[in-house]
């Protein structure tokens, strides 16, 4: 029987199957952070249980850490309690922790790939919705709830249904200033934020094939914004090159054995997908969200859509509501929208390639005096690499604040947030109401577009600038 990549990974991890279609899957890697794990550990104590596989469990502090100080007190009492609990839990249950003093501390979905913890063919879970990021390596990865975190800690397994298969083939020629962020935002806008509900999405096509691993991670990171359980990209030579000599990657003879296995991780010819999309990105422009959902997105030269253009009454009502919240009027050009803050960071766009692309725009330039801008490297490793290349100096000289690693302004869970009615150009993954702070207004963009917004104080078309 011909199988998709998803089916191969799923089937190879089945420990037990039930007649109702549910299976118990073995989990290869369990990633933890300070927010969704405390209750799970406490429940283990109450039940007098241990962690089944401490060596397959890794933890970091990221969601509510301060990006201005390594002081555990800096983000408030609740954040302090959560971080203290993580320290206590990891020590008691013998789990490796990337705490505030660890040189490689950072965002969970950044540090795991760069350390070689994330490998093709794995089943990976984390109490965070953007665990789909790891699918870029051909790993079946998805977010789980706190009760499921407890179950994986105790058993190293998880009950899961079998999802349907979707293929999104991305074809065409990538234009000037078009990044992986623009590609995935365009796809979300094209097919909608619920198109992937009930599916695992496999991304393929010549555009995906040419992407670096960091670009692929951006694409898979936002598969969840299509409503999918996760996203996948088959591993190839680009994957192997990225993983070679990483700290936790296989070494020596094990490396060759691993590659032999990884080469089998591809969808078989004539395998059946339940739904297929072919999307040509040849003529797309840099993308900017205008509403309160990632699928409310348009090209930089476009206007906020007129409500009458929506034939679907639900989408029409959502557009009206979004415009009211975002304080935008239909017919307004994106390039006429001014902003207050710029955020470059998050598990979507805080890797070294993201920082390099933004720094090229900012070099020898100064940001608008009306804009406050911060750049937050995704990990200690990214931060050191950027500093060794002098990128920190470029950002600082342009007027950005150069911060410590963390989730930062992606979510209003730490000190980095929007004030009431502030408008932000953000490289994060969600623009929901209040996501970056109470009544804050979020526009999702690529690092290039964020850098341009900082320079001009408004959204700008890079194709029309010198």
Swiss-Prot record:
Mitochondrion recorded as keyword: no
Cited Pfam families: Aconitase (PF00330)
Requisite cofactors: [4Fe-4S] cluster
GO biological process, any: L-leucine biosynthetic process
Pathway per the UniProt entry: Amino-acid biosynthesis; L-leucine biosynthesis; L-leucine from 3-methyl-2-oxobutanoate: step 2/4
Alphabetical UniProt keywords: 4Fe-4S, Amino-acid biosynthesis, Branched-chain amino acid biosynthesis, Iron, Iron-sulfur, Leucine biosynthesis, Lyase, Metal-binding, Plasmid
UniProt cross-references to Gene3D superfamilies, sorted A to Z: Aconitase, domain 3
Cofactor note text: Binds 1 [4Fe-4S] cluster per subunit.
Protein EC: 4.2.1.33
Signal peptide segment: none
Oligomer and partners: Heterodimer of LeuC and LeuD.
Primary role: Catalyzes the isomerization between 2-isopropylmalate and 3-isopropylmalate, via the formation of 2-isopropylmaleate.
Family under the similarity heading: Belongs to the aconitase/IPM isomerase family. LeuC type 1 subfamily.
HAMAP family with a match to the protein in the record: LeuC_type1 (MF_01026)
Protein name per its UniProtKB record: 3-isopropylmalate dehydratase large subunit
Organism: Buchnera aphidicola subsp. Diuraphis noxia
Gene name of this polypeptide: leuC
